[in-house]
Amino acid sequence: MHAFCVGQYLEPDQEGVTIPDLGSLSSPLIDTERNLGLLLGLHASYLAMSTPLSPVEIECAKWLQSSIFSGGLQTSQIHYSYNEEKDEDHCSSPGGTPASKSRLCSHRRALGDHSQAFLQAIADNNIQDHNVKDFLCQIERYCRQCHLTTPIMFPPEHPVEEVGRLLLCCLLKHEDLGHVALSLVHAGALGIEQVKHRTLPKSVVDVCRVVYQAKCSLIKTHQEQGRSYKEVCAPVIERLRFLFNELRPAVCNDLSIMSKFKLLSSLPHWRRIAQKIIREPRKKRVPKKPESTDDEEKIGNEESDLEEACILPHSPINVDKRPIAIKSPKDKWQPLLSTVTGVHKYKWLKQNVQGLYPQSPLLSTIAEFALKEEPVDVEKRKCLLKQLERAEVRLEGIDTILKLYLVSKNFLLPSVPYAMFCGWQRLIPEGIDIGEPLTDCLKDVDLIPPFNRMLLEVTFGKLYAWAVQNIRNVLVDASAKFKELGIQPVPLQTITNENPSGPSLGTIPQAHFLLVMLSMLTLQHSANNLDLLLNSGTLALAQTALRLIGPSCDSVEEDMNASAQGASATVLEETRKETAPVQLPVSGPELAAMMKIGTRVMRGVDWKWGDQDRPPPGLGRVIGELGEDGWIRVQWDTGSTNSYRMGKEGNYDLKLAELPAPAQPSAEDSDTEDDSEAEQTERNIHPTAMMFTSTINLLQTLCLSAGVHAEIMQSEATKTLCGLLQMLVYREQHRSWCTLGFVQSIALTLQVCGTLSSLQWITLLMKVVEGHAPFTATSLQRQILAVHLLQAVLPSWDKTERARDMKCLMEKLFDFLGSLLTMCSSDVPLLRESTLRRRRVCPQASLTATHSSTLAEEVVALLHTLHSLTQWNGLINKYINSQLRSITHSFAGRPSKGAQLEDYFPDSENPEVGGLMAVLAVVGGIDGRLCLGGQVVHDDFGEVTMTRITLKGKITVQFSDMRTCHVCPLNQLKPLPAVAFNVNNLPFTEPMLSVWAQLVNLAGSKLEKHKIKKSTKQAFAGQVDLDLLRCQQLKLYILKAGRALFSHQDKLRQILSQPAVQETGTVHTDDGAVVSPDLGDMSPEGPQPPMILLQQLLASATQPSPVKAIFDKQELEERMSRCCFWRRRTTKLEQILLFIRRMNSVCEKENTNATASN
């Protein structure tokens, strides 16, 4: 080109052509497309919500909710009319078929057997049919034998007899007993003698009895009202025809299949992958198919991925319904009958053939509906048709959203599906709240035919399965991208809109689409939808999302410290000392300095201005600052103003009229405590934080829904969910949402309780209950919640299946309770802190239950619950009796001469002490004071729960019906008595009566006769005698355990009538003198009968008490419990201090020796 240029050639710029990013462009057409997607999503959502409840449905709600209408209408067509004048009903179908014939044909098509035609012939009194005549003869013969005949005999055409036949047909149809009636007339075909059919099946007998009662009721109505039989029976016949001709049976195969067939059930995700891997090598070994077939199979597999995750023909009844091999076509019923009566796994078939399970409530409900003076008008039919119409509109809505996505996936912008699904969930950018989306696809359509229900559930299941698949795709792409770029999740608290801290899951391009998918799944799901979601890997996807989001805090310890700040496990005596009120200055510069503008004042000590402040009470308000000359200006309530001396010449004319406003109380002393979660909703609105909240809400929703529907869910789905909860609690990742209290809230059914009480769960919960140092208020809360969870799930255990586990767990609980009562290791940190704070060895007394006693009371309540259950009662009784017999062995092994009370108890270092104390504590209780987590009574609020104790001794209580907490002083609360031990569940055999008699004997022993033994183990002055302490503690628990006998008066009378065990023969005093025993059995008249236990208790009770008679029983019991727990804690601390002193003395000796050698 240079050769053809004229002049100087200018080189062009080397800049490339800039191609704009299509994703960042916007135009009116693009906005229109998004808005149309939003509107179409809203339209589909309104269709899915369908029509609201009509006034007619609300009016007829009583009968629509009864068991009669549970099958719905016989027809599944919407275009159904009812001629009210001619009392005819029909479906708008082509052709002119009469109503009766169309009904009969539809019944035959619906049921697919001959029972409906047989029942229809009975209702029409077609005695020309041999089967009908034979059946009616058998019924009449049986009614005569059992005296179920009416006093008046009516001809077959009489209205009363017509009512009887129609009611008989209705009961047989709605109880699904038509096949039973047919079996009675096919005795020849079955090869069974006619004699055996004289005794009808129990289900048919119950039907005959209801029919007889209905006939008697009609006769009575005719006699009382004086109307003709035709007038009395006409409305009854109308209602019975409605039940027979228009309603589907309440108990039928269709409904049974619906309940047994897991429509949306699917295998767990990992099992499907494993089966797919196993099938691949097998496909390689089989002969290769033609290419066209392979291509079709490939396309079919790709298209059926969603269907495979949604629908799987997995039903527990498939195994039962295998075709039975028939030996001979002539004798086809005999092998069937032998199979039914011989094999237990064909229980469902035996029920269908023999009708073994009649439903008495349904029989009475049908009879009540037929005889009730209420016409079956067209409104009830309209109610049932309204539900059919609502179901079709809802199906149209879900079909619309699925078709819209398929169109938008291939032809529309990527942002259009987001707008469309926002409309589906009614999330509009601006405007008023238009309500919540549909939560249950079967809402208000319970009475539609089974096929329509299945169609609705399957279609909605496709939408949920599609949402799970999209979430999986987004998370897999995000995980691969983060791994490629080396992005590590950061703590969620460091991510804000001002400081994004780099890329995160909430900032990826698909984040908004992921949020809307999570929101779509956060609903109250039914059992079938839960099976689909849990087995499709939804829980794993949620865990992946949380991993990509990052931890919610820097460390678990910070969370622990934050939650434990300002909390205590008990109320110490020192925290209840109230500070003296500050005396306000009467005069002086301090008083003048407190007078600010607006302060209310009155005349003071130096007042000399007459009645300027009148009329009484003479109050005013400061309106000017105090001047340097010592004058201040005041406006009185009368309106006059003047200046007064406040420091001038040393005079003070005014004083304060009211106390100054006190300082604002701290957060822990406020009167109310609301949830802090509501305050954090607007604190962090970063997309990643929103993603975290949405994921947590999805997990909580799935857990709560599973707790409600676990009885009809797949066991694999329930195990998957409970396995995730167990893993979170084990790794201590549950503090944000999966707390032990939340896990307890879903333990509602036997299925969930059985899964939550597996060996892994029990081991984990016992580890939490036993706890570990440091023992804080937060750790005590976790221990209490773990005990409550055990109390919720352990009643589901079956003794035949888990007898060994029950015995091991019961022994572990008693051992742990014994260690708590003997060691009190969890109270040592509290004692040490109090000691170091006060610089003295004597600790402060606890006004509420301590850490150890609170936990011990919870374990005792758990054992009380288990002891009331049949499967646990025998094990616990056996353990209690074995421990109580140790007292008997002590009596038998020690001489009565010169024996003291503590001689009958095991040594303090004996392991038997813990077991004995645990058993006595279970029978008699431990500590009746206020405790954390316990139920208390407030004067104004009633029964509340203690949830927190502040460091200043204030107690936070929570209502059971709301989340608002209140802070109350200790003196406003009273403990609610716990559930007492039920002595009636103990076996009082003759050997155990003697054991209890010896316990009562120890409880009533005379304390002044026992000499306190000086321990030789005391290392320094002031150390507690462990033997004496243990003796006093056991004596206290024996006294409490004896009170449990008050509710068993007959056994208590037998125990108190037994002879008392004499304590001593002679008692030696310190100076060597001998004191004769006070046996009371020697008199001038001769020997008297031996003393019984009742006399011994009376003698002990009338002794002079060393305690003043100003304390009631409750105060004495609290002082004794406090003394025992305080002494045990003191003993533990003394051992620690003794060890420290010994170590210090050893170190001092070594230092002295080293100095001397140098």
From Swiss-Prot:
Compositionally biased spans, kind Acidic residues: 293-302, 668-679
This protein's GO CC annotations: cytoplasm
Superkingdom, taxonomy of origin: Eukaryota
Region listing for Disordered, in residue ranges: 281-302, 662-684
Gene Ontology molecular function: any one: metal ion binding
Domain annotation MIB/HERC2: ranges: 587-660
GO biological process, any: protein ubiquitination
Any single Pfam family the record assigns to this protein: MIB_HERC2
InterPro entries assigned: Mib_Herc2 (IPR010606), Mib_Herc2_sf (IPR037252)
Name recorded for this polypeptide: Putative HERC2-like protein 3
Gene: HERC2P3
